[in-house]
From Swiss-Prot:
It is found in: Cytoplasm. This is Imidazole glycerol phosphate synthase subunit HisF. GO terms for cellular component: cytoplasm. It holds the Pfam family His_biosynth. Its EC number is 4.3.2.10.
Length: 256
């Protein structure tokens, strides 16, 4: 029996407000994170991802208070990331009510941190977030590189090899964002999504670029992702989660 594919609204939170940008820039306000999360819970979203997008850049810790408020009102799995650098950061988030914690920049600087976190808390609650950008030119074999600090700093690391390394260290899931597609609304980067999904045995969540319901289905059917994440199309009322599930089911995808 095929595992159900998940639909995950993503809340990018900047100074306590949900925002949405294009290619990590040009931010617009979308509202209060707890109100928005509650709406998605009521709509039947499978999970919610909360990313404090200011945390790594400004060196601030994720807003535990917002996580506590959200966890008290939302009863689906909650993944939280942004500024997670230590085992204590993870413990604090889990204690505040997060079900999973997403590690991004810190994994690049200290890959063993991922292994330590998985050993301490279990792989099931450790997500490694990867921000990838295509760096190969026309006619070259496709290659994607990892960027950190909210997509600002190149690392020289190959995205597919890095994802395999993270799986080996104990990551339970990969949250893969295409920086080329982020906020562009013309679909996922299916090349990198498929390359990483096919290389790993753990779930890959596709992120970055959803503009319509077909894009969500493409992430599963062509990108081979286990879950699809979107922000703009849900936040600004273009589509609802039930509409997304109905469309995916019509394409033959098993949804919850």
């Amino acid at each position: 029996m095929a595992l159900a594919k998940r639909i995950i609204p993503c809340l990018d939170v900047d100074n306590g407000r949900v925002v949405k940008g294009v290619k990590f820039e040009n931010i617009r306000d979308a509202g209060d994170p707890v109100e928005i999360a509650r709406r998605y819970d009521e709509q039947g979203a499978d999970e919610i991802t909360f990313l404090d997008i200011t945390a790594s850049v400004d060196g601030r810790d994720t807003t535990l208070h917002t996580v506590e408020r959200m966890a008290s009102q939302v009863f689906i799995p909650l993944t939280v990331g942004g500024g997670v650098r230590t085992v204590q950061d993870i413990r604090n988030l889990l204690n505040a009510g997060a079900d999973k914690v997403s590690i991004n920049t810190a994994a690049v600087f200290n890959p063993e941190f991922v292994g330590e976190a998985a050993d301490r808390f279990g792989s099931q609650c450790i997500v490694v977030a990867i921000d990838a950008k295509k760096v190969s030119g026309p006619g070259e074999a496709p290659r994607w590189e990892i960027f950190t600090h909210g997509g600002r700093k190149p690392t020289g690391l190959d995205a597919v090899e890095w994802a395999k390394k993270m799986e080996g260290l104990g990551a339970g899931e990969i949250l893969l964002t295409s920086m080329d597609q982020d906020g562009m609304k013309n679909g996922f980067d299916l090349g990198v999504t498929r390359a990483i999904s096919d290389a790993l045995g753990i779930p890959v969540i596709a992120s970055g670029g959803v503009g319509n319901l077909q894009h969500l289905a493409d992430g599963i059917l062509e990108g081979h992702a286990s879950a699809v994440l979107a922000a703009s199309i849900f936040h600004f009322g273009e589509y609802t989660v039930p509409e997304a599930k109905a469309y995916m089911a019509s394409r033959g995808i098993v949804v919850r």
